[in-house]
Swiss-Prot record:
The lineage of its organism: Eukaryota, Metazoa, Ecdysozoa, Arthropoda, Hexapoda. Signal peptide: none annotated. Residues 424-666 form the Clu domain. PROSITE patterns: CLU (PS51823). It comes from the Eukaryota. mRNA-binding protein involved in proper cytoplasmic distribution of mitochondria. Keywords: Cytoplasm, Phosphoprotein. One of its GO terms (biological process) is mitochondrion organization. This is Protein clueless. Residues 78-88 have a biased composition (Polar residues). Residues 1-96, 110-129, 265-286, 726-773, 958-1010, 1414-1448 are annotated as: Disordered.
Length: 1448
């Protein structure tokens, strides 16, 4: 196995591995060689988790120095902050000496947390109370590093770091980055790369470590050349545009023109605040070019014309004996040509020419250990250019240089210069992945690595961190390898393992990964939908793998699974079970069925393991009959197969039916849906029969039933108690049980008719009841019920539980039991009688009720949640995530659109949903279209498809003369996979039981040139048909023009969404969609196609616990404690995921907000700057999360005096918003309000008025005229108009504000009084102005005593206060008198037996909150509005809590 082999050889290859993995500062294969150095990463005692230290410390400070400016303010920084020069780069990550210590006492607090459940926050909080964050820090050690030709370097390191990390530091520093082949020596003793610093003898404070140049080997020489190439290309964005090596783009530095923290405060009169034309309100079609600003100057200076391996390689035998390793060929910028020899001592110029081989050294000879030194010696241009590249490289933020966890692709790219690059060519045609030629054992055994990491111990915190980090690292490498392999399979670069069979039935193995192209060739899915079922099966299987991995049952193994969509095909990549290819399928499977239920097997070990998993996943063990009518017990669906590998592990696969079916999309004879569902058009016959309910829905359904169960039981027990009491004293009974039972019959929800019958008083009463009060009432009812159970007659208590179980539909009569049988509606499956009370009829009803709950409860809940517009989806991706978080499948999108179409206040969401539906329908058509296209026509076919989709102009697809000349025969692998229905079948399952297949759309195959027959009209007719068939929704448009006019869709938004959905990269230029003379898109406009990759995301459980505990503290108003816990979560995330990850970004955003609320705007700016860069690189430049990060950063920039930068950031956020979804969105109103206010502060009143008018228009549309947003917009408009001298308009607008405040807040409220005072001043000014104007009109001349209008610009402080209000932050002033009042109130409410200490503790917490800033008039912060979290939150979409603090 690769892991074991590498473990044996790790010492021998330590230096080489460290240098190999560092050849690119942003290279993916940096973290300790695939499984982090084998020997160390699998040793639980090695504490190797520290080798990937925190780029961002717990207090949000980065290694690049912003936090060094902090002077211990608020003492939130628990570890010393070192200067920038002391930062350590480990595996490409900037290091801090902050590590996670192996402290057992603290680690054990989270030892039992395997899978945090939805209700896990209280437990997390309890754990968090016992966590000492100081224990997670480590002391630093200062050492000096002496390098040849460089000054002595002083570095502060952690004593738990590895020697290898010093290698990474030196390879990242400007002075030493060109060295790769060296060792580190202390007192003439060479240090082990994988030794911890604390284990090194004689290493003390101030010790000097010497860098010693080592002789080259062939491998080291190649590594060095690769590293030099990467240094020269460091500034080139080509790899990011091409989607190579996990590089990606960020433009924050371009927009801010440097680090925000290094900028000085700007005076308002020196700010250039004119917005670009495409940012001003009223833009209908935003341009594309600003998406990539300054793209022409992104590339650094060219240092060499050519650096490549020479054609004279490899050295002949005699030269090998002289020490020659390899030959290089270089062309300098001076146009001089050199042949260079690499030998064990270094590099020198030889006397070879293009025609003559003469390996002897040139005269005069110059030998350099570093190739950079040699090139600098022979080329002055190279020396100057390399110095410039290095300076610009080191000026970039550390986050810009680190590799992302997964590849992020761009949907638009400029024309890229294609240069000579031998290493790129070598990588492209190498059968291995990146650095695998440097790994002992060569090819990696992915399955062994994936399973071995899961078997690592997990009892203590260090063990769990090591385990999760190893899982994440191996998984990331596997995803990268699987993606590359899937693309190679489609491109025809991989030989099938069964080449003699029909191409549709071929299977592939590449790099120890199994690939299947899911054509349903053996009618495996014939009864389930054929190719359509085969296409979706891998996606459902991936869902199953995800949930079983999350449950994480010890001894139960799943396969590494990645699903790749590329060029219209779906490829499933899986790790290979040991021995699976050596046996027939029938011999391999020991559990489940290989023929959909005819032959069913069971296995006691599998039953034991799956029963444990089923408890978490709510899967009901059930008994089915096999073909011999023998009962067989299963704890999963019949399709789930169990195979015991040659390694003795118990594997499960084919998890496509982990969850129960969705009966709303199955036409079943014995199922009668409710009248409400029938009226809505259900059941809808889907094109396949694999539709399943989501796990989120089942959890919500069970939770809803559990609340009903408790309420009914409590009501009945109260009734029994009252009856007993009434026998002694005449008392009125409490409401009877029947009412509670009736209420539960509709899944715990009131019928719509019942809601409409409520009178206004009841509705107001219900609205006024807070969530906390309702929760408290339920808790009290439960407690009372429990006490009643203890005191009541046991028979009566059992009867109460029985009736409550019957009322909510529990499977068991005497116990609350909700589990689901995934096979309950499977065709051909015969069920035996279940356990007592779990009859098949009950199981079917339960599945039906869950599906009904989705339609009648979850869809209304989804829409109600978005009615407040507090977390508005911005594009189809965020809409899909929101639907999934409510357990709603995207196949219900048509029903959601029908409801939204009747709600004008949800117009923006309706438009986004329609756009997403059109994109998905078009994707189905595109996949089939692409499968019928020859490889040499791909560019022409894709551009023709885009013309048909986005334009109504001429679309004459002409095959270019170049392509016609190339055309011959069928031309490539692509056509071998044509399907009669555009799909792909299941291969490995049919022969090995190891794979699910996949399929695409549903049109008939045709000749390779049929794509030329498509027209805009025919495409939109297909889209309409697909929308009706798949989503049961009538798309009322037959062209792009009608879609734009009827639904308000922007063409550019549709193009972006479609390109991202199917993997198209178009040329970065402006497109004229209205062109009537020539097609909008040509062949040259299609730059590339990239894969769409679906995979599971490993979790960091301890970090999740820290995060949720921190959220709980924040909700209690304990900001400092919350800050510490969120910082701890960030530390743990950095240890598990590395520096860049989506969840790290969520932590950074929260830390920045907390810093701002705690009064430290500079710290907030430093942290938020990193959050923006991280979101751009990990999520994408135009991702909804990136827009959110930009708006936050603009606020913090303004608070730090960077007024101009704040405007630029808002302009960027607004441009991205309009590009993605247009101007008609509630979030645009927020951005426009911010822009208007800052322009107002700068005296640009006309521009300010344009933005605030647009914001007011949107706020009126989406919030109504009785909303705080609208009142605030009226007030801002009045302020602007008064400064322009338009007092009449200002007076009218301020009246609107005043009337709202008076009606909603009362006359005595502070806001009402402020508005009244504003009205008085405006009225006074208006009357004075009108009086003077009347005098002018009456006299006909200007009187000399007309006073000038004095317009006092607002102070920056008042503008900041208003910005805070707009963005949902309110600072409430609390005086000492208020604190005394609060003390008396608390004393009244405390119990009489409370001690004085308890009272004082309560007072002290308030005083501490008030003293956060050390001011006489102190402040408690209150976030009055949760910011929209458009992006994915920490750990599977968990919402970040609103940061609220109560002032009492």
């Amino acid at each position: 196995m690769a892991l074991e082999t590498e473990a044996k050889n790790s010492n021998a290859t330590a230096t080489g591995d460290a240098t190999a993995t560092a050849t690119k500062a942003s290279g993916k294969a940096k973290e300790n060689n695939n499984t982090a150095g084998g020997k160390k990463n699998l040793n639980p005692n090695s504490n190797q988790q520290n080798s990937n230290q925190n780029l961002v410390n717990g207090n949000g400070t980065a290694a690049d120095g912003p936090a060094a400016k902090k002077k211990g303010k608020k003492n939130r920084n628990k570890s010393p902050t070192e200067p920038t020069t002391e930062a350590v780069l480990s595996n490409g990550h900037a290091e801090k000496p902050t590590v996670v210590d192996a402290v057992e006492d603290n680690a054990d607090t989270n030892a039992n947390v395997e899978k945090p459940q939805e209700g896990g926050a209280p437990d997390a909080e309890a754990d968090g109370d016992d966590i000492d964050l100081d224990a997670l820090q480590d002391i630093g050690i200062t050492v000096n590093i002496s390098s040849p030709g460089a000054d002595l370097l002083c570095v502060q390191l952690s004593s738990m770091e590895l020697v290898q990390e010093i290698h990474q530091l030196l390879m990242d520093r400007e002075e030493t980055c060109h060295r790769t082949c060296f060792s580190l020596q202390l007192d003439n003793v060479t240090l082990d790369n994988f030794a911890e610093l604390k284990s090194i003898n004689n290493l003390e404070q101030g010790s000097t470590i010497k860098v010693v140049e080592e002789p080259y080997t062939m491998r080291e020489a190649r590594i060095h050349v690769r590293h030099v190439r990467d240094l020269l290309k460091n500034l080139d964005p080509a790899d990011a545009y091409n989607g190579i090596d996990c590089t990606s783009l960020t433009y924050l530095n371009t927009i801010t023109q440097g680090d925000l923290l290094d900028k000085k405060r700007t005076r308002p009169d020196s700010v250039d605040c004119t917005p670009p034309e495409y940012v001003t309100p009223g833009v209908s079609d935003p341009p594309i070019l600003p998406l990539h600003p300054n793209v022409k100057n992104a590339k650094g200076p060219q240092a060499l014309k050519v650096l490549t391996t020479s054609a004279w390689n490899p050295p002949p035998g005699p030269r090998k004996l002289h020490g020659d390793l390899m030959y290089l060929y270089v062309v300098t910028m001076e146009d001089k040509r050199f042949h260079i020899s690499a030998c064990s001592k270094g590099f020198f110029i030889n006397q070879s020419t293009d025609d003559t081989f003469n390996p002897k050294p040139d005269n005069p000879s110059h030998l350099s250990h570093s190739l950079i030194d040699l090139l600098s010696h022979i080329s002055p241009s190279f020396r100057r250019a390399f110095q410039t590249i290095q300076k610009r490289r080191t000026m970039r933020h550390a986050f810009e240089r680190v590799a992302t966890p997964y590849q992020v692709y761009q949907w638009a790219a400029p024309i890229l210069e294609h240069t000579v690059d031998a290493i790129r060519a070598e990588d492209a045609f190498s059968s291995k992945l990146g650095y695998e030629e440097h790994i002992p054992g060569q090819t990696r055994d992915w399955n062994e690595e994936l399973q071995t990491t899961r078997e690592l111990p997990r009892k203590t915190l260090p063990e769990r961190l090591l385990r999760e980090r190893a899982i994440f690292k191996v998984h990331g490498d596997f995803v990268t390898a699987a993606t590359r392999g899937a693309m190679a399979v489609i491109d025809g670069n991989v030989l099938a393992i069964n080449p003699g069979e029909d191409t549709k039935m071929q299977m592939f193995i590449w790099n120890n990964i199994f690939f299947s192209m899911g054509f349903d060739v053996r009618d495996h899915y014939k009864e389930l939908g054929g190719d359509a079922a085969a296409f979706v099966a891998p996606r459902y299987d991936l869902h199953g793998v995800r949930v079983y991995n999350a449950v994480d049952i010890e001894g139960l193994y799943t396969l590494g699974t990645v699903v790749v969509d590329y060029r219209g095909y779906r490829v499933t990549a899986q790790s290979i079970i040991p021995g699976i290819l050596e046996r027939e399928q029938e011999q391999s499977v020991v559990y489940g069925s290989i023929d959909f239920g005819k032959t069913v097997l069971s296995h006691p070990k599998y039953l034991e393991l799956l029963r444990q998993a089923g408890k978490h996943l709510k899967i009901l063990p059930h008994v089915v009959l096999n073909e011999r009518d023998e009962p067989v017990e299963l704890c999963s669906s019949v399709e789930c197969k169990g195979i015991i590998g040659n390694d003795g592990r118990h594997y499960i696969l084919d998890l496509l039916r982990t969850f129960p079916p969705d009966v709303n999309f199955l036409k079943l004879q014995d199922v009668q849906l409710s009248k409400e569902l029938v009226d809505m058009g259900f059941p809808i016959e889907h094109r396949h029969k694999l539709c399943c309910l989501r796990q989120e829905l089942l959890e919500a359904f069970i939770e809803d039933r559990h609340v009903n169960f408790i309420r009914i039981a409590a009501a009945r027990l109260q009734q029994l108690t009252t009856i007993k009491q009434s026998e002694k004293s005449e008392a009125n009974p409490v409401p009877a049980l029947e009412g509670a039972e009736a209420a539960s019959k509709v899944n715990g929800a009131e019928k719509p008719d019942d809601k409409e019958k409520k009178n206004e008083e009841e509705e107001k009463k219900e609205r006024s009841t807070s969530g906390e009060a309702r929760a408290a009432a339920i808790v009290n009812a439960i407690r009372e019920a429990q006490s009643n159970v203890a005191t009541s007659n046991e028979v009566q208590a059992a009867e109460v539980v029985k009736r409550a179980c019957a009322a909510v539909g529990s499977l068991k009569e005497k116990e609350f039991d909700f589990r689901f049988n995934p096979d309950v509606f499977s065709p051909g499956i015969r069920h035996a009688d279940g356990e007592e009370g779990t009859s098949l009829a009950k199981q079917k009803v339960l599945v039906q009720e869950a599906a009904e709950f989705l339609v009648l409860k979850q869809i209304p809940a989804f829409i109600k949640e978005h009615m407040s517009h507090s977390s508005s989806p911005i594009d189809g991706q965020s809409l899909t995530e929101s639907l999934h978080s409510h357990g709603i499948n995207v196949r219900y999108l048509g029903k959601v659109i029908k409801i939204l179409s009747q709600m004008p206040r949800m117009d923006y969401l309706h438009r986004i949903a329609v756009l997403e539906l059109i994109v998905r329908a078009t994707k189905h058509i595109y996949y089939t279209y692409m499968q019928n296209t020859e490889p040499l026509h791909l560019s022409a076919a894709i551009s023709h498809f885009l013309n048909c989709l986005l334009t109504n102009g001429p679309v004459n697809p002409a095959v270019s003369s170049e392509e016609a000349h190339k055309k011959r025969g069928n031309g490539g692998k692509h056509n071998k996979h044509k399907s009669s229905k555009g799909g792909k079948g299941q291969q490995q399952q049919q022969t090995t039981g190891n794979q699910n297949g996949s399929s695409s759309g549903s049109s008939n195959s045709s000749s390779a040139s049929d794509w030329t027959l498509m027209t805009p009209r025919s495409l939109w007719q297909q889209i309409r048909k697909e929308a009706k068939v798949y989503w049961d929704w009538e798309l009322d448009c037959d062209s792009i023009e009608t879609a734009v006019s009827k639904y308000g869709i922007l063409r550019i938004s549709l193009m972006r969404a479609f390109c991202l959905k199917v993997g198209i990269q178009v040329l970065l230029r402006e497109y004229n969609f209205e062109s009537k003379h020539k097609p909008t898109f040509g062949d040259d406009d299609i730059v590339n196609v990239f894969p769409i990759v679906k995979h599971i995301s490993p979790r960091a459980t301890d970090a999740y616990n820290f995060y949720t505990t921190g959220q709980a503290k924040i909700q209690q108003g304990l900001f400092k404690e919350g800050y510490e816990l969120i910082s701890g979560a960030l530390n743990l995330l950095n240890n598990v995921f590395g520096a860049l990850h989506q969840e790290n970004g969520s932590c950074l955003r929260m830390l920045a907000r907390l810093s701002y609320l705690l009064g430290d705007a500079q710290d907030a700016l430093a942290i938020q700057q990193r959050a923006v860069i991280m979101s751009e690189r990990v999520n994408g430049m135009d991702h909804p999360s990136t827009i959110l990060e930009y708006t936050h950063l603009s606020l913090y920039s303004f608070a730090n005096g960077h007024v101009g930068m704040s405007l630029k950031l808002l302009y960027r956020a607004r441009y991205l918003m309009v590009l993605i979804c247009g101007e008609d969105h509630p979030e645009v109103a927020l951005i426009d309000s911010n822009i208007s206010l800052i322009l107002h502060a700068l005296g640009e009143y006309e521009l300010s008025l344009r933005f605030i008018e647009h914001a007011l228009k949107l706020n009126l549309k989406y919030f109504g005229d009785k909303d705080m947003h609208v009142a605030l917009s009226y007030h801002l408009m009045a302020r602007t108009q008064s400064c322009m001298g338009d007092f009449r308009s200002a007076l009218n607008n301020e009246k609107e504000t005043y009337s709202f405040y008076k009606s909603q807040l009362g006359e005595n409220h502070e806001k009402t009084r402020d508005s009244a005072e504003c009205l008085r001043l405006l009225t006074q000014q208006a009357v004075l102005l009108q009086r003077k104007m009347n005098d002018i009109y009456s006299s006909g001349k200007l009187t000399s005593d007309l006073p000038p209008i004095h317009i006092t610009p607002p102070s920056m402080g008042s503008v900041l206060d208003m910005l805070n209000t707009i963005n949902g932050i309110l600072f409430v002033k609390i005086s000492r008198k208020d604190i005394v009042k609060v003390r008396s109130e608390i004393e009244k409410h405390f119990k009489t037996d409370s001690t004085e200490n308890e009272v004082n503790d309560a007072i002290n917490s308030i005083v501490a909150a008030a003293n956060n800033n050390g001011e006489a008039e102190d402040a408690v912060s209150k976030d009055i509005k949760e910011q929209p979290e458009a992006g994915k939150q920490l750990t599977n979409g968990d919402k970040a809590a609103a940061t609220e603090a109560t002032s009492s």
